[in-house]
């Protein structure tokens, strides 16, 4: 084996190692974890058709578990301030159970992250396609979520519906 071939092989091994380390850093980064937490919340809020009560309560329970102790939810003009887990669960369940289908996509995500303090603010626009009793609709909302790192997980500390942008309400 020539010196040139050995150098190419070592260069390839080094490049693969650097790529794997970069991938690991990205996957484990707080930035990525916050975005995944939002993706999870959106997926749990969605539904494609009728749900049995056990599935509906299970999804509601999983959604409520994404909120930190001492959370605050503000969804004006649809709801007042919510700080109680049982009230939050009832509101989420009522909104989800009233819909035949909910599909959520988001855009314009902007994340501000302070790793040292373990806090983050994520603002975005949520586009919600819904079907309530055969009446399909689409609405868009500007949302701000303050996240807090709690026991290694990113949880919602403050959820605010900042602005209703367009469409009919799914609340």
PLM regions: where:
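Surface-exposed, charged secondary-structure patches
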Residues: 87-135
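Single-pass alpha-helical transmembrane signal-anchor segments
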Residues: 10-25
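Short, solvent-exposed secondary-structure junction/capping segments
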Residues: 61-79
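A mature extracytoplasmic/lumenal domain signature
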Residues: 77-79, 108, 124-128, 145, ...
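Short beta-strand edge/turn micro-motifs at domain boundaries
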Residues: 2-5, 10-11, 27, 119-121, ...
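Ser/Thr/Pro/Gly-rich low-complexity linker/stalk segments immediately outside membranes or between
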Residues: 28-42
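Hydrophobic pocket/interface hotspot
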Residues: 63-64, 71, 88, 122, ...
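Short acidic-aromatic low-complexity motifs
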Residues: 39-66
């Amino acid at each position: 084996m020539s010196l040139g071939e050995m150098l190419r092989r070592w260069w390839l091994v080094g490049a693969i190692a650097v790529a794997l380390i970069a991938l690991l850093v990205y996957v484990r980064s707080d930035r990525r974890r916050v975005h995944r937490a939002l993706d999870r919340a959106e997926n749990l809020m969605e539904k494609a058709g009728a749900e049995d009560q056990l599935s509906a309560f299970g999804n509601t329970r999983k959604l409520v578990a994404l909120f930190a102790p001492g959370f605050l939810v503000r969804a004006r003009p649809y709801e007042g301030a919510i700080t109680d887990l049982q009230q939050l669960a009832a509101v989420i369940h009522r909104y989800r159970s009233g819909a035949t289908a909910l599909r959520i996509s988001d855009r314009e995500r902007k994340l501000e992250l302070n790793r040292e303090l373990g806090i983050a603010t994520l603002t975005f626009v949520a586009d919600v396609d819904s079907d309530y009793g055969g009446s399909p609709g689409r609405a868009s909302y500007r949302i701000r979520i303050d996240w807090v790192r709690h026991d290694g997980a990113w949880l919602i500390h403050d959820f605010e519906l900042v602005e209703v942008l367009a469409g009919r309400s799914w609340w």
